[in-house]
């Protein structure tokens, strides 16, 4: 089969490729990479390191070291291993969207060597449908197998893959033999209709299905099938520390009070949590709590999801990807039949759909880089200038959730940086989208409060003790000397950031 480097024996082919017309299209990763044209818009599977292209994109990065070729790369979210780094370092990227989490690519973005479009994750497909961004030329989709009609059985994520395959002129499929052939039945793939008069998305509970368990494709589009045998890059799960434990305790106490006043029950409403150690730790806190029969309607299902399944606290989880540690991944694979009926993976325009988030009454828990005394949140930029990763799905949930919660440490880097400041250096989520703010110091419930009331609650409950006096003094001076609905002293609003730049500390 065209010098394919990975052995494709008869048994493997019978298991993985059930559509006979594809058998003549098995090629190597290098051959597939050679099919990518300069200036192509490539839509590749992958969402938070799960279900991504593990051989074709790395092979294209290698090719770009020797040839003057570059592409626009659109994925679901971040890619695993060093793929984004390899592409950036070989100058293989013209544009990148909608999310990334790689240090080398981040450097290229901040040097404007790669044009980065930081999008709400629910909007990428919408913009492709409407023609707001250039259409997909070539889709690269990871699969566990191909069914009798040539359709793709996805792996550990869906992301934007279903629409990429629908819109692309050409498709390359990576069949990953590390994923068991029985890893199917958990996917719910649907391609949205165009405007006008689009149908509603008929999801009323996290368990509802509206699509198919495979990605439907036109077999004539398929250029090649590449076999790989590489697992997803494992997530690094940090043990909860005193900061994340405190944040979790504050949130659990808040939920207890909401139950006591009759606003919620001990099953709460469907939970969403962003990626990362803080959100994962917060969810872990439910494990030893009174909260039972929980459900999730989220983007990324992390280790905490499976810990809560095993502890009996969580009944069902819907997401767009499964991004877990090596140990948790093996537990999932070994016990897949046990977990199968508790999981759904959806396209990210469905998992993050504002329509569904509002209908289900999601409790959204996302991580902030910093927030200010009036409740505005910065999720993306360091000191207002340098891109960190991207807004991801936090905005999809924040504006539409039943409860919009943002969490972060009160201070970091030996307390040289305060994460609560007079004015955020970059706005991702305005005060209008934020209900609850939580740090290790405490929780600020901002619902129904005017700006000055919010400032009092945030300063009292969320600011680190080493910064509280100065931030309170700033606020009181702003009230006295400037006044207004949202008092600010523009000459001093960013003094914490300028001090950090000049001295290496906000103190």
Task: Kindly label every feature range from the protein language model.
Residues 4-507:
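Conserved alpha/beta enzyme-core scaffold
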């Amino acid at each position: 089969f065209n010098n394919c480097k990975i052995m494709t024996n008869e048994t493997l082919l019978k298991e993985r490729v059930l559509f006979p017309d594809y058998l003549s299209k098995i090629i190597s990763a290098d051959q597939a990479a050679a099919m990518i044209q300069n200036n192509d818009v490539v839509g590749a599977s992958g969402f938070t390191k799960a279900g991504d292209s593990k051989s074709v994109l790395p092979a294209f990065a290698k090719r770009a070291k020797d040839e003057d070729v570059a592409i626009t790369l659109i994925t679901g979210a971040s890619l695993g291993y060093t793929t984004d780094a390899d592409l950036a370092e070989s100058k293989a990227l013209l544009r990148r969207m909608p999310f990334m989490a790689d240090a080398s690519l981040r450097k290229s973005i901040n040097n404007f060597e790669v044009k980065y479009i930081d999008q709400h994750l629910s909007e990428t497909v919408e913009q492709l449908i409407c023609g707001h961004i250039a259409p997909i030329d070539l889709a690269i989709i990871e699969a566990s197998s191909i069914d009798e009609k040539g359709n793709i059985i996805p792996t550990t994520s869906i992301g934007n893959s279903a629409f990429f395959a629908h819109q692309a002129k050409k498709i390359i499929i990576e069949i990953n033999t590390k994923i068991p052939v029985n890893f199917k039945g958990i996917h719910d793939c649907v391609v949205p209709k165009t405007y006008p008069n689009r149908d509603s998305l008929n999801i009323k509970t996290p368990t509802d299905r509206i699509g198919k368990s495979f990605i439907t494709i036109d077999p004539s589009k398929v250029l090649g099938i590449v076999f790989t045998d590489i697992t997803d890059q494992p997530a690094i799960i940090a043990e909860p520390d005193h900061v994340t434990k405190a944040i979790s305790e504050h949130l659990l106490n808040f939920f207890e009070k909401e139950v006591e006043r009759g606003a919620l029950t001990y099953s709460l409403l469907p939970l969403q949590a962003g990626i990362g150690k803080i959100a994962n730790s917060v969810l872990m806190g439910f494990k030893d709590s009174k909260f039972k029969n929980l459900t999730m309607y989220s983007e990324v299902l992390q280790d905490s999801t499976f810990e809560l399944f095993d502890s009996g606290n969580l009944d069902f989880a819907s997401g767009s990807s499964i991004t877990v540690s090596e140990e948790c991944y093996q537990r999932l694979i070994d016990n897949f039949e046990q977990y199968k009926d508790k999981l759904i993976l959806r396209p990210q325009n469905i998992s993050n759909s504002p329509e569904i988030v509002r209908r289900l009454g999601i409790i959204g828990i996302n991580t902030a880089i910093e927030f200010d005394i009036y409740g505005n949140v910065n999720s993306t930029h360091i000191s207002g200038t340098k891109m960190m990763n991207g807004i991801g799905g936090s905005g999809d949930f924040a504006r539409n959730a039943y409860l919009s919660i943002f969490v972060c440490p009160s201070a970091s880097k030996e307390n040289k940086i305060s994460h609560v400041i007079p004015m955020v250096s970059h706005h991702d989520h305005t005060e209008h989208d934020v209900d609850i703010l939580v740090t290790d110091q405490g929780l600020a419930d901002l619902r129904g409060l005017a700006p000055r009331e919010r400032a009092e609650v945030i300063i009292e409950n969320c600011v680190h003790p080493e910064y509280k006096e100065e931030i309170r003094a700033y606020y009181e001076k702003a009230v006295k000397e400037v006044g207004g609905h949202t008092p600010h002293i523009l000459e001093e609003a960013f003094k914490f950031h300028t001090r950090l730049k000049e001295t290496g500390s906000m103190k």
